[in-house]
Amino acid sequence: MVDKKANLLWVCSNDFSSAGIPGPSIVPGSYLKGFDLSSGEGKVSAELPGKATLCNDMVVGEDGSLFVTNSLAPQILRLKPGSTQLEIWLENPAFEQPPQGAPGLDGIAFGGDGNLYVDTFAKGDFFRVDVKDGLPGKITKLKPSRPLKLPDGLRSTGGQTFVMVEGGGSVDRVTVNGDDVEITTIKDGIAGPTSVVPVGQTLWVSEGQLPHLFEAAKSGPPHLPFRVIGVPMNK
């Protein structure tokens, strides 16, 4: 995620060795990394606290704090401006993973109302977290117009409208009206989309092909090369 104000590119770096999947290095754990947008130099490396960690999605708040979802614990973490240590901003049983341990909290974005919106990957839930003076308040489980299939990356497009990808293969327009959420599919048939970034009138969607990573014996090798595809926002 690009943070223009801080001049940083924020990314997650995760180790999947606990799931039997070797990573590119021997460094264990899950980290939030910040790189200088101009030089590419690493500026921040913050390890997620705890034993069950999977850095997933992130959003910048009005004060420059970074809010990060942990998919292996019911936690939203916060990195304050100038800090290199993540703290637990909110932990709540509403965000618990399924019993089989599939990923929980995933996409995260602020709405035009100043509140925080998150989705959960395996359970397919969509929540609003009331925010006042930088602190979390009431958590409300919202009502999507149709079931969500592996909701993932979430980004605001202004007001109470968002774009979201579903691991089931679609990128959607998400409109929040009170406790109701209207889901409109913009494009489907995408190979396991994991994230979306709106740039102008184009949505850039990454194809993650996650079944080929986590269910390699069943799904076989991924189809190379991995792609980032452009989707017209108003399609």
Predicted regions and their residues:
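Beta-rich, blade/repeat-based domains predominating
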Residues: M1-S17, L48-F67, A94-L116, P144-T161, ...
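Short loop/turn segments that connect beta-strands within beta-propeller blades
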Residues: D36-E41, K80-T84, D130-L135, T175-D180, ...
